[in-house]
Amino acid sequence: NTGGILAISGLKIKDNAFSDVSSNIMFNSYTVGSVIKGASNTVGYLNNVILKGQKIRDGCVKIHYVPKKCSFKDLGYLDDITALKQSSNYYQFMTAIKLTGNTYKYNMDLPVTVNDFNKYRDVFAMFGLGSSTEIDFPRENTGIKGSTISSDLYLNLAIGQYDTYTPLQILNYINTIANNGVRYKLS
């Protein structure tokens, strides 16, 4: 429980040959998709828009000027934990909409502000996402925070498809969850 890193490795396979890309762990960032949903649920809990155990019916969200956004398949009725286990995009979209103070209606306008984005980013940073790990390496990448503010991108942020994070940040995030919310400084 110290945050000590014992080894770092990154390999890329191309044409049946391995190449060392260990530095990508600190210097490259990626959209991480559904990995983010544990932190997204935490955003909902901390802002009192997710009630533990409350069920909703999975489906699609249709926002004005935005194509329908759905889970990968119809997942039926879901509570917060089942939505996380089955990776429901819809559940995260509904949480994000509630976070803006709106109630979902088909084809609604969804005005969002930088403050709505920051509600997610501030909680994500508590897990080490989008912030420096403070590891003792020069030029650590902290990922890219998208600067365009739109309802579509806001919903994408909630499912890990907008901002980018480094593999080292994801390691920090997973370790924070595994340590019951205690975030250790990586060293």
Question: What are these model-derived regions, one by one?
Answer:
Residues 1-28, 42-187:
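Beta-lactam-recognizing serine transpeptidase/beta-lactamase-like catalytic domain environment
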Residues 35, 39:
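Active-site His/Glu-centered metal-binding helix of metallohydrolases
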